[in-house]
Amino acid sequence: MSPRALILVAGIAVALAAPIAARAQTRGELVGPRTISTGLQETSAAVTPEGDTLYFMRSDFAERDDTIMVSHRVGGHWGTPQVAAFSGEWHDSEPALAPDGRRLYFVSNRPVQPGGAPLTTEMGGHRFAGTNLWFVRRQPDGSWGAPVHVDGALNDGAMIYNPSVAANGDIYFSAHRPDSGAAYQIYVARRTAQGYAAPQRVELGDVARNRMDPAIDPQQRFLVYAGNEGDSLGSADLYIAFRQPDGRWGKPLHLPGKINSPALENAPSLGPRFGELYVSSNRRDEVFFPKPRDNTATLQQRLQQPLNGSRNLWRFDIADVLRAHGIDH
């Protein structure tokens, strides 16, 4: 979700009593420095089950021009990304693969009917690109088919963000809806034989807290999301909630280690390996003065590097967090 949409609610820090340990195991790594992660905005990683292809969103700094990119792993490194075959014309963002890799979901302002006007929406007196949920199907030759609009109540309105798909087809997403409170909440649309049921809000606590960008475990045992539960280190941090024996969600826990920072962390997604977590963050390198004197060329080069305050992609390992809550695969 765009930083413009992060209308976060301040609160009193709360103490979280949870068996989260092994903080040293959650140090992250920048994904594809200068290839994937650049001086532009990159967010919303979606990695294929084989681990050899990465889809992500790249945009200008204001995130008014979003495009879905694709990169293939070559020789152990991510190759130069290209515009995905189904993107490049509309405001397309936030790709998410189904666990089996056969569908790729994304949000877009493209018109629902051919020849129509692009979607727009308004919030807090600001007008911006609207979004509905779309998907593409994997074809027998490995390519993607034409984008398909997801019909039904799930796409009511034009503020659907960051889809995440469970193994049974249930779709989690964030949205601003009549029961969202002042900002955003997380919803789930259950897949049925008749299509998708009306979305239900995921009960994670007081709706005065802003919650967005869900990343659902394929078996729906846990949910990672971005927000501020009162103890955020920055404008938004990442939290995890575990499914309880009675089916309800447990108290959200602030993820440990270096996953969160005083910067913005959001748009989490789960990789194909156990415990693999991709995160978008605008954390940056510190600049100390006096610095080595720049000339025009070195200044331009340095300012175009990742970690310049733009959002980049990071990869973390939360396997120990999951094991501490009885999940080992």
Tell me what each language-model feature is.
Residues 1-9:
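Bacterial N-terminal signal peptides that target proteins for export
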Residues 9-18:
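Bacterial N-terminal signal peptides
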Residues 19-23:
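Signal peptide processing junction and immediate N-terminal pro/mature segment
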Residues 24-329:
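Short, conserved micro-motifs composed of acidic
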